[in-house]
């Protein structure tokens, strides 16, 4: 499944996020919550929501061209697996965000869930608002660098 769209949600007092209804079937077999490595200037940190199969594929592809004995491989491997958490949707279609991921992404109660192709991303709503406005301004320049027009 390709994850698309933007949805505003609120975490409950136990840091549970209700998954948007259109994605529940795709995530029914399990969920990996993971810290998203941010590489874009000004991008707020986020949590990614993956299917286990998609996350394993992402991790494998990320590590594929590195020597398993290199320091870079070990650092990436640690990040990918130490900053992720296996879980399942509960009966109310929620996932509990563990404290270490809440802290990593600096999430408050109000969040934005965005489709990012292979996964969903969860951002703090106030931090995401300024970032999304900035990205909209930069899209034409980014696309032009690759010979495309938006």
Residue ranges of each PLM-predicted region?
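Flexible "stalk/tail and boundary" regions
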Residues: 1-9, 13, 23-87, 91-92, ...
């Amino acid at each position: 499944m390709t994850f698309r769209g933007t949805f505003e949600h609120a975490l409950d007092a136990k840091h549970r996020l209700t998954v948007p209804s259109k994605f529940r079937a795709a995530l029914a077999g399990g969920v990996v919550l993971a810290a998203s490595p941010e590489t874009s200037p000004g991008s707020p940190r986020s949590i990614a929501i993956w299917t286990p199969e998609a996350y394993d594929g992402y991790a494998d592809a990320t590590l594929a061209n590195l020597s398993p004995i290199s320091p870079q491989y070990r650092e990436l491997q640690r990040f990918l697996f130490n900053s992720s958490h296996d879980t399942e949707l509960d009966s109310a279609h929620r996932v509990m965000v563990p404290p270490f991921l809440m802290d990593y992404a600096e999430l408050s109660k109000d969040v934005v869930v965005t489709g990012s192709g292979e996964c969903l991303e969860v951002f703090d709503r106030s931090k995401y608002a300024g970032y999304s406005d900035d990205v909209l301004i930069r899209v034409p320049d980014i696309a032009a660098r690759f010979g495309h027009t938006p």
